[in-house]
Regions:
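Conserved catalytic core of nucleotide polymerization and phosphodiester-bond processing enzymes
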Residues: 1-122
Length: 122
């Protein structure tokens, strides 16, 4: 497997080389009892998605310590706050979402934040 800077491990159970016709491929056992192949772009995509999950997961904990999370969706967090808290909450969320984790201090993160009365407005 691949150990990320956060300590999370990307596992490829029973990783092995197998012939597919006349070419050699890397294959692993998926959790659904299927066999899948591994190639560079798949490893890269999985690594990026896992790193993003770690970064946003840590940010969500920090945000939740101050404001209750209403909803998360992929790389977005949604809060329900009083109107008078909206600007302050948005600034706080943007700050926390851009904070680099201690295990990857050189990463540069960006964020877009919006205020609305409904999900449709945001």
């Amino acid at each position: 497997g691949i150990v990320l800077p956060s300590g999370l491990m990307l596992a490829y159970p029973n990783l092995r080389q197998e012939f597919n016709g006349d070419k050699m491929e890397w294959r692993y056992d998926k959790s659904t009892r299927e066999i899948d192949r591994v190639y560079g772009a798949k490893v890269f995509q999985g690594t990026v998605q896992a790193l993003a999950r770690c970064v946003i997961g840590e940010a969500m904990v920090r945000i939740h310590n101050v404001y209750p999370l209403g909803l998360t969706l992929h790389d977005a967090v949604y809060l329900t706050v009083k109107d008078y808290q909206a600007d302050e909450a948005l600034k706080f969320v943007e700050t926390e979402m851009c904070r680099a984790p201690v295990w990857l201090p050189e990463i540069i993160l960006g964020v877009e934040g919006h205020i609305g009365k409904s999900l449709k407005e945001v």
